């Protein structure tokens, strides 16, 4: 619930924590006086299914097929999925940007993703910083038309599980530190690393509780 609520909120979902919990527990939204976007409901439900998928596949090697499958689960049934130019479960067809930064062009995404995965999967011992660095590179490629942040954070969670590292949730309240860390990675890796370590401490508190 925490992972889904926070990851979707970072991307603009307006659902409350209670509404998110209600979808998880009953697969319905419940009564609400506030207007709720249908996509917020769909993407909350599909994000829960993505979490099921990363838990079931935690020990498997990261691959293009798996990453595309996560995107397919996340975006199926959304308004985006009905657009001709939006590729559900496949790489982007149109250029996009994140935070004013240009990302990899559509025609170069496949090659860039293959290289990123080959470099990452060749590591004998994966540490937390390797997972964070993969995330930074993934977000800079921005391989999908939309949903990159959520898929990227799901990948981090999965890879932490795979390598025996305490996973973490980037909560909505620390998103500005998270975004700064992504932007400043080349100059100062400590910003994002410290943000993730702080989030890890919060997750440890959940486990202890």
Residue ranges, per PLM feature:
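FIC/Doc superfamily catalytic core
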Residues: 1-209
């Amino acid at each position: 619930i925490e992972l889904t609520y926070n990851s979707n909120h970072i991307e603009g979902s307006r659902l409350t924590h209670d509404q998110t919990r209600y979808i998880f527990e009953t697969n319905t939204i419940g009564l609400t006086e506030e207007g709720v976007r249908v996509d917020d409901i769909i993407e909350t439900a599909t994000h829960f299914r993505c979490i099921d998928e990363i838990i079931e596949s935690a020990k498997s090697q990261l691959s293009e097929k798996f990453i595309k499958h996560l995107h397919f689960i996340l975006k199926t049934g959304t308004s985006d999925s009905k657009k001709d130019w939006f590729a559900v479960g496949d790489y982007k067809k149109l250029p996009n940007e994140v935070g004013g930064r240009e990302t990899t062009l559509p025609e170069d995404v496949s090659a860039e993703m293959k290289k990123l995965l080959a470099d990452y999967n060749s590591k004998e011992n994966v540490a937390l910083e390797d997972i964070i660095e993969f995330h930074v590179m993934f977000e800079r490629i921005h391989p999908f038309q939309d949903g990159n942040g959520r898929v990227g954070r799901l990948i981090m969670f999965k890879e932490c599980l795979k390598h025996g590292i305490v996973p973490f949730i980037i909560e909505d309240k620390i998103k500005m530190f998270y975004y700064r860390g992504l932007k400043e990675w080349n100059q100062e890796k400590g910003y994002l690393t410290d943000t993730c370590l702080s989030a890890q401490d919060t997750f440890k508190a959940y486990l202890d509780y």
